Swiss-Prot record:
Lineage of producing organism: Eukaryota, Viridiplantae, Streptophyta, Embryophyta, Tracheophyta
Native source species: Prunus mume (Japanese apricot)
Segments traversing the membrane: 1-21
This protein's GO CC annotations: membrane
PROSITE patterns: CYTOCHROME_P450
Protein family membership: Belongs to the cytochrome P450 family.
Record protein name field: Cytochrome P450 71AU50
Domain of life of the organism encoding this protein: Eukaryota
Residues that bind heme: 435
Lipid bilayer topology: Single-pass type II membrane protein
Any Pfam family matching the protein: p450
Cofactor (UniProt): heme
EC number: 1.14.-.-
Subcellular location as annotated: Membrane
Amino acid sequence: MVWIWATIGLLALVHILQAWWKNKKKRLPPGPRGFPIFGSLHLLGEFPNKDLHRLARKYGDIMYMRLGLMPTIVISSPEAAELFLKTHDLVFASRPPHEGSKHISFGQKNLIFSEYGAYWRDTRKMCTIELLSNHKINSFKSMRREEVSLCVESIRAAANNRGVAVDLSDKVSSLSVDMSCRMVLGKKYRDEEFDERGFKSVVREAIQLASAPNLGDYIRFIAPLDLQGFTKRMKSVNKAFDNLFEKIIEEHLQPNDGERTMDFVDVMVGFMGSEESEYRIERPHIKAIMLDMLVASMDTSATTIEWALSELMRHPKAMKKVQKELENVVGLDKMVEESDLEKLDYLNMVVKETFRLHPVAPLLIPHASIEDCTVNGYHIPKKSRVLINVWAIGRDPNAWTDAEKFIPERFEGSSVDVRGNHFQLIPFGSGRRRCPGIQLGLTVVQLVLAQLVHCFDWELPNNMLPEELDMTEEFGLTVPRAKHLLAIPSYRLRKSA
C-alpha cells in the first residue's frame, strides 16, 4: 500500500512541475495558492457557489485556482461570462472528464457531459429538431393538461381536510416525474416496475452521485482506486437504468397499434443503426440521451417551481399580485390553459426573479477549454475546467439593485430574459452549450406555478409568519430546498371549475 501512495505522490509532483514550467512565464488570472496534489479543494465547503463567490470578491471576477490537479477558471460577473460564453464560445464549448457521467450515462455518451465534437453536434441537432422543437413540445400539451389536472384534484381533495398541510415539494416532484416519464418513455412508471429501490429513489441517487465531489474528477489517476466508493454505486445505478431502458427500447421496437402517442423514445429508436453521421447510433447512445431527458426535465422544473412557491409565500403581496393577474386574464371559472401563459406578465417576472435568486444549477455544468487561449489578457491553459457562477452573477450589485431581495417588478419594462442573450441572467447557460430544453422547461414551470397559485390560496402551517419560512438550500447537481415546502391549501376557484 505504501508504494501505491509513493507512486501517486511522485506522479502528482511530476504533473505539477510540468504545469508550473509550462505556465510560469504566462499571466494566469489571480487566485489562491493551493497545496500540492489537492490544490485549493480545501477552500470549498458545503456550498461551493458561495465559497467561490467569497473568493472572487478578493481575487476578481476571472479567478484561477487548482482543484486537485485540474486548472480551474471561475467566472463571477456578466462581463466575464460574456467573454467565455460568447466571445470565445468555441474554445470553451467542451466538457471536462466526469466520473459520474462515465459510469452512469453509458460512457459519457449523453448530451450534457459529452465532449465537444461531431457526436455532440449531431446529438444536439437531433434533440433540438426532433425532441425539443415547438411542434414536439406542443404535441404533449394535452398530456401536460391531464397531469396538472390530476395534481390539482389531489390537492383539492386534501384541502377538504381543513387545516392540514400538503407536502408541496413532494406533489411538484411527483408531477414532474410523471410528466417526464410520459413524454420521454411513453407512460408513467410505478416504483415497483423499476427495481427494489424504486424509480424515484434511483433517479435521486443518480443525481446525488453525479454531483458528489469525486476525487477522481480532480486527481484523474486515482479514479480507478475508487477511494470514496462512488464507482461501485454508480455502476449499480447504471445497471438499474440499463435494465429499464432495454425493456423500453424493445417495447418501442414493436409495431405501434396507432393508439400510443409517439414519444421521445420512438423518435430516437428511428435513428438507431443510422450511419448518416460520422458515427453509428446504437443503444448505449439512445439510453444515455433517455437518461439526460429524464433527469434534466424532471429535476430542474420541480426545483424552480418549489422555489417560486416559496418566494411567493414569503412575499404575500407578490402572491396576491399574481393571483389578481390570473383572475383578470383567466377568471375564477376555469383553470389556466397554456395559451394564457404569454398574457401573464407578472407571473413571468416572478419566474425570472426566481431563476435569478435560485438558479437550478448555480455553477452550471463545467465547461472545458479545447486549446490554450488568452481572455482579457489572461492565459487560459488547454483543458482548464471553467465554472460559471450564475448564483454570484445573479447577486452582482453592479448588475442588480437590491440584489439580495425578491423584487419581480425589477423586470417591468425590461427586455432581459433567461434565454442566454443577457449575461446577467443565464440560468440555462449561453452559447453552444446552452440548455436546448429552455422552451420546454419554461412552459412546465409557468404552467404548474400558474395553476397552483390560481386554484389555491396557501397558508403556512403552525401559524408560521412568512418571514419565518426556512429557505435553506441543499447543494447538488441542482439546488432544491433542504426542507420540504409544507403549506395548507384552500380551493379558490368557483366550485364548478
